[in-house]
């Protein structure tokens, strides 16, 4: 443990020195937090964003890549006023696994698919050209991109389990060991250092100087998966944050948390983590159907119930964190299509009502600084109910039915809701 702590400290000192030497960077181009508000170019920054987990894959020149399509999707989002994208840096572990996205970035510990890394480079260049921002998450507590389970398998914990194959309870029993496993965590810390310290192969500049990055995010929905693991979970989150800040002091650091639902229902745990100085702003996610706030048979007849439960969830977290002057971003929310359809262009009356409510909640008060809907699929069209190589990547990863929460470019009423809210957010930021 002393060796690990010493290694981390030396890395922090080394990369902090590099940061001091960086020149020619306008800090106003970077998102910051001032007095409890997100700021950009000296003005409050409120936004309507989206999730586009697959963007680095699409930006690559390998399997799954299509740079012309990427640019078209970015142009469409930019035209809607959606300039904030939450993106997976890359998947970990083996390929060809059930529920697992492909291609992967890190097939073995410390071994990288350079095609995906170069895709990430290209993506950041394209975002910079459009004045767009990215939240880049580095890990995942869920199986669809490897994450916890990949690191545990590499650390000798046994074969990674998959909920759809092995059962959800069995999966939880497996991944709850991540926050306790020193070897697995060190493998992840090595990955963090490798990615955050990277220089862009196109521009030659370190990632730390890219204004396209709003935030480095520790993971997608990080969890302890047990009450007993909460203390080690907190230390894992804050250790990762310290490593990131030691390499890149310019960009924000966030957790990717769902809120108390991701902290074993402990609001105290969520508050304690987000109040720490290593974390710049707070995250929550909201999933009314998944969390059973609303019954299946009232999903489309009682949207108001989902809205009220969502407001109460936001309020609880705002009340808990406001004394620490940390803004909250609702970075995932979603709602089913009418009649539980997955088809592009099918009716979205209930979804549109819910999106309108959430964006209004963000725009008409101080509880939320921004929101990212889940998820953008744009011109992609699912070829199968479950993703198969090499179908279009959609906003629904491989563990979900394709089209489940996707927003397609033919969902005109939903796009209208998004564009109107984004325009209001733009005016609020002037």
Report the location of each language-model feature.
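Active-site mouth of glycoside hydrolases
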Residues: 26-294, 301-327, 333-428
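Bacterial N-terminal signal peptides
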Residues: 7-16
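Positively charged n-region of N-terminal signal peptides that target proteins for export
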Residues: 1-6
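Boundary at the C-terminal end of the N-terminal hydrophobic targeting segment
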Residues: 20-24
